[in-house]
Amino acid sequence: MNRVSVLSKYQCLKINSPNRFFSKYFTTSTINSTKITNDQSQTNSAGKEISQPILKSQDKLKKSILKTSTDTNFLKDINKKHRQHYIKPQKDDENIILKTLNDLKTNNLNTKELISDRLSELFLNKEMIKLISENEIESINEIFKIVLGAKKSQQPPTVAFFTKSFLNKSSKEFKMKLDSLPIIVYFLSVFESKDIMKSSDSDSDSTATNNYLTVGKGISKKFIQNFQDSISSELDITDLQEHLSDMIKLSKFSRLLGYLTNVEISRDKIKKLKDKNEIFNQLINEFGENINEIEFQNLFKNEIHFISFLLTLSRNQIITILSISNNSCYEEEEEVEEVEEVNVKGEGGELFKRVDKYEDNNKGIFNQNKIKSLIENIPVSKVRERLYWFLLMAKLRYPISENYFNDIEISLHYEKDPSFILFFFNHFKIFGYIPSDSSEAKIFQRYVRVATLDEALHYFDSIKKKPQSLNIIMITHLLLAMNKFNNQLDRKIIIDSTTNTTTNTTINTTINNNKIKKYQRSIENEMLTLYSSKIKDIIGSNSSLYNFTLSQLLHGEKWRKVLFNTLVTQLIEKHINSVTDETLLIINEYFSIHKDDVILKKLYELSKKIHLSKELLSNLTIQFLIHKRDYSNAINSLIELYKQETPILKSTLKLLIKSDPTHPILFEFYKTLPQQFELIEPTNQEQEQDQQDQPPPPQQQQEQQQEQQQQQEQQQQQDQQQQDQQQDQQEKQQIKEIKPKLKEKLESEKLINSELFLECINDPMKLYRILDGKIEILASTFQSIVMKSLESGKYQFVESIISKRFGDSSKSIDKHLLSKLITIPNLPISKDDPYNIEKLLLTNNRSENLALYNKLFNLSLNNGLLNCAKNYILKIIQQSNQRLVTSLCYQGEEALIYSYILSLNNLNIINNNQENNNNNNNDLKETIENQIIKWIESVFGCNSLNEINNDDFVFSILLGFHHSTSAYYKKQIGNLNEQQQLPSSLYLKIRSNLMQVINKYFDLIVLDRMILSSYGLESKYYGEAIDFQKDFISMITINELYQYTILKLNLLEKKNNNNNNNNNNNSYYRISIDKKFIENNDQSFNEIDLLLKNISTKQISVIVPFLMGFIENPSLMKYLSVILSNDLNKYDTATTTTTTTTIGNNFIQRLMESSSNSKEIDFLNISNTFFFKYFISVGDLKSAFKVHFKQIHILIRFRLIQDILKNQPLVMDHIFKIISSELELEQQQQQQQQQQQQQQQQQQQQQQQQQQKSSSPSLDYGLIESLLSVTSILNDSKSIHFSLKLYNLASEHAKLNNSRIPLSITNSKDLVLSGFKNRNDHFQLSENLKISDIEKQMKQTRGAGADGADEIIIKNHLTSSQLLNDIKYILIHSNYKQLKGIGFGVLRGDIPFTINDKIKVFLLVEAFAAEEGREKVNSFLNTPSLLNNSLDFELLRTPKITKLISFIFRTNSSIKHDSNYFPEFSPDFLPNKFKFYSAHLEDINNNDNDNSIQDISNIVNCNSGPESFYYRKVLKYFFKKRILKNL
């Protein structure tokens, strides 16, 4: 019985597999180490549901199976009868089956009463299977139970037959569950058992057995397929097969050990196993009781297969097995609770380490010390044993320290089988241990070290196929492996010489030095191609990866330098945006190592192209100049630095000191520094004495000493180093000439480089003492001292020097210092004296105090000092009178209300965190809320809002509030807990107040003006301003707009009449309009008509915002378009007065006149926006873009154009046509300029000016960039094509003007394409075709046609679907003109494609070029159906395309006709080629009568040659015509 209990534990052996799908489902049940008795197994069987893979109730069945499978007698009865023992069902059979099934469902089936053979046979009967399936048994486990119940069915043939028929017939009808897998595996294991083979007595028996074995294997395959279908499509069939066979082998102990270890690894060791089988049988049969102590120890210490067997079990099972041995020399293991399985996937792809700790109470066989001693006792030569123990440790989740990793490294160092290293490495990861980057790299390096070159390259190839797996660690492995390859042959020789002298001599004789060099060269080339092709693509814009790779290439062989150069070039050309300061520092370091001028130049180029930190830029520039010995420029640029920001100079000088501390330029520069202290320059004799009093940095003294030493050395070695000395003298001479200029500049600027001094004299107090009293400390120096002191916490010192500097004297505190102090993140605010800094800073009652209070308020809040915060906010509210806040707004401070609102939200959050002070905080919050509302009301309630400044103020408050609430709500809603509710009450209160204010005072002109100017395009509030404008215009009715407009007109007149009269009574300007009058649409329309008709030119600017209100409100837009429309028919709904027809025309003309004459940018922007929106809404696209074309990018920034482009795709084509027509116009003008004489130039200029006003002829790169940015947001195929067209247009324009396209445009285009690529995976190019290759080839062979593209296509494509995919990609991402030959190349017949595929390719490429086909192809390109055979050719069938294809069929004999696709191309379609030629030419001539037939016939008839030559010429001509027309 003991044997059975042990065996039962292995029925659900956990599959140890990297396949995550498996780990999800194959969870092991917890196993008790207690023995299971008969009673338990019987009593437990009835009531329990079948939920786990192996049930205790089935132990009997398992026992019987195992006994029969190992019992040799049962095979003697095997003969053909077994396969024919099935009988026809009788009438009662159905009832029996149904009853049995019912019992199964209700769990009444008692396994004690073993089911009769008859019942078992019934279940095996083919005709009964259907009946069984109709009864919906949830799992096939129950059926198997019944089948196993009968003795006869336990014999392999019966089981085989049943399994086969059952799986074949019913797997789709039954729901197969994973828990049935172990039972099925049992069946399958019977056929593969060695015992069957051993026990066959006669030949006939063995053949029968073999038949069953083959049946079994067939079943297993069939089963795998069904299993895969029914369980999950995720499963990889090969994986499943592999794991299934593992399970089969696991479940038979007789073959357990041979398969538990990785078969590939240990083939040689399997033979040795037979001798040791006895130990294992003993271990298994008498497990835990009679095992010999020594044998048990030996098992652990020396038997590698036993450990590998343990590795295949679940953690609990391992512990159970190892803890059973009571009599062994090890302590007894207490029962261990199952720890949850650790998620080995890792979230977000990050490297991770074990989180859970395995509690080790120094009990049981497996405490860490014992494992450690075990490992230490294993001889170093037994590498595998040690490594397996490490794996076992990992499996049991012991913490593996760095020391262990070292041990692993050492062990791996001696392991010579690369496949085992891979096995080890992968399993180590599976068990959830990811070593640090360096450890992993080292471990993996061992693999590369023992692998042959081929194996390693094969590994690299596998990486190449999965670019995403090429992470930083893998690159490390590759780079580390490089060195090894270069010396691999030598290593082979060395190793072989140590092992075998004969092989050494043979190798030496066969491989001579030349071959070794050649071999190394090939390796270098291989690595270079691998890196330059793959890694560049993979790295892309990943700057950290780039930097890592570059840093790895700093030292080493020649190919590394080559690669470094190519990567840097690639960086400059393609990924300039991913260049960081770090990148430049690496390149700089490379230069300092190799002194490579080429790199330095590239670095210099690079630094010019990108917006780097000024620091680096200056460092590079100066280094470059010094390297070129251009000292005058170097010093000049140092002076430039000196004028700008101090930190730059500091780092530049530091860098120079680092690279060459004795460089003369440094001394000269340092010597000039003391001059700016306004000290009398000491004479040479005094200089040494006064040195200590002056504050030059300590480095300077060292530098000077070094210089003196250097001069002495030079004198000593004068004879040897004459040239060097001369060079030095020249340099010094140059510097002497520059020195006076340098002094002049520095003295005139009166600068001080305080940062440099602070850097050299670290202690700010010391520096202050050095400077104090001797010279007037400049503000910047003082500021630095204060800031440094505050950082280091010397508050008293700061207090004393500030009070000394500002306290007694009448001087007010320095503004810059104040602004700096306010920005200190942790300005000290103590609970005892919250005003300690305040006392120092608040000298008089100037406006900066408000900002300071604001800062102090926020600080108090962040430090949790709520009472301080309350005091400060009350002070702010008391102090902030309207003028003060207005002036602050003008100073660029954020609207204060913004910070208050955010602060309240913070208070609220603090409120929730500090539950103790809940009531106080609520009170505080309420008082502050009330104060703010009172404050807002008081500010808004004052009667002097007529001044424009105050409109600004109101707007800034509104905008600030809108910004703070919307931004805060957007940001915080996701991040806050439910408890932390936002102060919505305040929001609603203020919002209602705002609406009152808006209704009372709102001014659309102010709004528009503020949006367009003060909060201009660059403002961070810009987006919020637009949203806000939309918000509040949407609340306004047409009546209010009209009323408001009248109000503004009166206001305007009033202002004109009384310029000096400040009338504060707003109601005076309000005109009360009768509601009935407003509600009567006809009448109000008439009023508006009259208003528009009679408005004076001066007043037009007032009207525009009114009209804008219409446009912003879609429901009102229709009224406006009716009023302004010139078309009477559109005006049927309203009253048709005589004035209406002319109003629209007059008004728009007058508005255009006034806007063209106006110098006010604000008005221009508003009116142009209006025109654009108005024309778009009316549908007059041409006018929309002609009105004021240059303004489109403003509209784009307004976010207006996005909606228009989305809803009206035609707009894109219009924009493009306008841009391109203007470009043509510009070209014409250029030609005219060349032809005309100087006398006509003035006229020409006048014309140009006029045209610029109307249509802006020069190409506006900013506009193109803006449009590209819009299309990147839209991200659909139309916008992609549009952006590519724009980009091509810009590049053509750049070529014409011999200029370069701005980098920003290229980046915008790349952004568009990358967004598109991410969205449509099926547009990716297949791996073996790179678009850059094709484009490169096209450039080379552009003159000779498109043969290059054909060759590439032919070389790289074996399947048509892949080619179609690539062509799709090319059409979308490239300029068609470069690739138009692909279609012909495919049709030529050189590619082994079917005719249908050829036609598909041809149609795609050429229809894209033909005008009729292009739109269809565009829509077609967006559907994935391109890859299916169900290509709808009707989409592309146009008259010209049809003729073209028939022409190809007629002229190219290598294309066989397929009438299914194109029935009209049957041989009878055209009698002969000549007719077709003439018809075709006639057709071309009729459509394009600007060319004569003669030209075409010349093309066709030129040269003799193969027929394909002619058709290509004709087609080329045809498509050339098409392309020119379109582009």
UniProtKB/Swiss-Prot annotation:
Residues 700-728 have a biased composition (Low complexity). Residues 262-293, 699-751, 905-932, 1217-1255 form a coiled coil. Keywords: Coiled coil. SUPFAM superfamilies: beta-sandwich domain of Sec23/24. It comes from the Eukaryota. Residues 683-734 are annotated as: Disordered. This is Putative uncharacterized protein DDB_G0292556.
